């Protein structure tokens, strides 16, 4: 008998991103490559993007508590991270409790803190992750082509001063989903981004909608 393991955990992506997300948003402009470098090697192997139990134990803090800022900024950071993770090439691995913003580290001696869902911010986070999962499943652009550049293109990877990245994912028929991730603590009014084709575009999902944050 033999076991064939096809996919590999992308530890480089995870380490770079965790380092970036823990940082004060002002200083992220000087470490912009932490969120872009993974695309240099994204298609060299079949990767899984892992947020595993190892990342939320042993003093590393829960995913929510890795985020800097006040209470609301932590939840906003978590939603931005999840949007980036779900639209980045690679299979996804998210450890239990991260989907509703558990504050404490995972403890195998007890169950998750389900009572947090009685609080609005945690409940809205769960609703956002649900909506994000539904969007992911309904749009093959986010998962159909994950092994070459036909499925991903940067629109702007260099806006480090505003800590913004824009890109699109494409399915086998060329249908695209455009993505904008703002890792700053600021809102950018009238932000201009490039698009691959002329036309009318609509916002399909936004982590800052009132129902989510």
Where are these regions (language model features)?
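Short, small-residue-biased leader/transition segments that mark boundaries at the very start
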Residues: 1-5
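Acidic, His- and aromatic-enriched active-site or binding-groove loops in soluble protein domains
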Residues: 7-23
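Carbohydrate-interacting/catalytic domains
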Residues: 26-30, 45-47, 54, 59-94, ...
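Transcription/chromatin regulatory elements, primarily intrinsically disordered
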Residues: 34-38
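Acidic (Asp/Glu)-rich catalytic clusters
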Residues: 39-44
